[in-house]
Amino acid sequence: MEYVFFDIECACVYKNVAKICVFGYCVCDEQFHILKKEDILINPNGKFHLTDRGGEGIVLPYDYDEFKKYPDFKAFYPKIKQLLEGEDKLVFGHAAINDVKYLCLETRRYKLPSFTFRFADTQILYMAMTETYDRQAGLEALTQIFEIDYTPHCAADDAYATMRIAQEMCGRDKCTLPELLKKYSIRFGKIENYQFNNSSSNRRNEYLREKSREKRERGEKRARFNDFVYGYRVRPQSQELRGKRFSFSRSIEEEFALAKRLVKEIVKRGGKYSLKLSGCNAFVEREGDDSVRRNAAYKMRDEGKITDIYTLGEFERLYATQENDE
């Protein structure tokens, strides 16, 4: 069994176009002994568009004029196909779905038969191992964690770094790579007939389903609160808060009974509630809140757009009557 790690660099990438200029790979045996490592330079038949006008973006460690000397993707298609396909090999990439998409787009561009192979993703494997499903671990970040030297965006080096990351993960769990995939319930991705699906892990899928459910529930809670604010119209009993337009932390808005009671107290005292942070001049935060909305409120205070920020406890002591939040 051979392990094939690969990485692709493109001259440009758009929604339905990816002009491959480098196919890098590193082939090793089951003990991670390197059998071959190579950069295949490819004429992309197009210009390089990797940076914006300000020079921001990717700079490949190659002389771009050199690519014109090489054949285009069609010439290297048989070799790449032979590298990736076959029952005697396991194929890996880091954020591999992007590279698989590039292969699919290029076969369509040159009217070549689709690739057919399965692949696993070291990024997804690492997230499953560390249970860090809320953020994607980039290749460069993992090379720092595992202390691996490599040249970023040199495709063969990226493939080598991906191999070394897989080797380090196997070393930490003291098992083979197939055993590691099984241990963390990694499902292979696949490309066939110009269609492809990503590698995945059962644990990450469960996490994403739970996050989706939580997001949906938060949205429903906020919608209920929004409807209340839009429809609540009563005559103020005093002008104590006249001119004050309040907004709350999202976590307060999502606790409907509490938020409803606080809004009633604001309106009763002549104030108003703004569903948009940009429309308020006073903000109520829950203790310990470090959300984007809360941080934006503090920035607005520094800019003079918000005059008062209260913790929930402070606000309730000053203005809110204590009732059962039902």
Which residues does each predicted region cover?
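Short, glycine/charged-enriched secondary-structure capping and boundary segments
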Residues: 18-21, 105-109, 262, 298-300
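Acidic, Mg2+-coordinating catalytic module of metal-dependent nucleases/exonucleases
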Residues: 87-97, 101-106, 133, 137-205
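Short, solvent-exposed loop/turn segments at secondary-structure junctions
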Residues: 96-99, 125, 253
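Short polybasic/polar patches that bind polyanions
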Residues: 105-108, 127, 144, 267
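A mobile, often basic/glycine-rich helix-loop segment
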Residues: 108-114, 118
